Amino acid sequence: MGRAARTNWLHETIPVVPVPQRVSLTTSDGLTLLARHWDAGLRDVGCVVAHGFTGSSGNAPVRAICAGLSARGFGVLAPDLRGHGQSQGRCTAGADEPLDIAAAAAWLREHGYAQVAVLGWSMGGSAVLRYAGLGGAADAVVAVSSPGTWFERGTRPMRLVHWLCETRSGRASARLLRGTRIAPGGWAQVPEAPEEVVGAIAPTPLLIVHGDSDRYFPARHVDALAAQAPAADIWIEPGMGHAETATTPDLLDRIGAWLAAATSRSALPQPAVCDDEARD
């Protein structure tokens, strides 16, 4: 591919959107998080975008997702989850990250967004599922490449993730190579797995997206989520790999269309509950 062709491809696939504004969030456990806000000029729907393990809001695939959603008219707030990027704290691999989602969702509401959708990829997907499933307020939820259960060791990439989290040399490598600070000592108490709480998200609109070529979390993870969330929309994407790097412009278009429809439904007035005693 020549230079001109590469330039044209970039112009066609990366929307022209405003430069994101850096903002600070404070979590309920006292951490300061860096986040980037893409202001689309509207205050109808704000989207929290949560990255995966060792990612950040500054990573190119994450920025492309945020820019794409912004170009479709959504406000976007992408935090660096705890222990990642320029945020404080240590990564807890999905245990405490729902607090980061809560801080981001609260920021959007405080800044005038009428509705808030929470979207996450991989570890970020587990965070938004646990946030919403444990009672966090959201008008729509999207989880892409999320685990359904914990302690996946059946795939080579996840065995590497466990090494990074569970060993001193692994944590040092994650910090040196990716800038990710991981909490030592593991979980004092195993948190609820996404499959254990996903059913409680209903009636909030929920979309679960998973690739059939995901090398981290095989199909049993999305099957576990689907079994517990019969009202969810489940998309199994042919040929798709894992998380942000596998999210194509076409998939992002479809997620954007789903979000627009889902938040339109959420904004409709709910039917009144009939009170038989009052009617008699």
PLM region descriptions:
Residues 201-202, 208-210:
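Short beta-strand/loop motif that positions the catalytic acidic residue
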Residues 134-187, 204:
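Hydrolase active-site cap/lid region
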Residues 54-67, 81:
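The serine-hydrolase catalytic nucleophile loop
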Residues 215-221:
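Conserved alpha/beta-hydrolase "acid-adjacent" motif
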Residues 82-113:
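Catalytic nucleophile-loop/oxyanion-hole region of alpha/beta-hydrolase
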Residues 240-252:
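Catalytic histidine-centered segment of alpha/beta-hydrolase-like enzymes
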Residues 1-27, 31-40, 244, 271, ...:
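An N-terminal hydrophobic leader/cap segment in hydrolases
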Residues 66-88:
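Conserved alpha/beta-hydrolase
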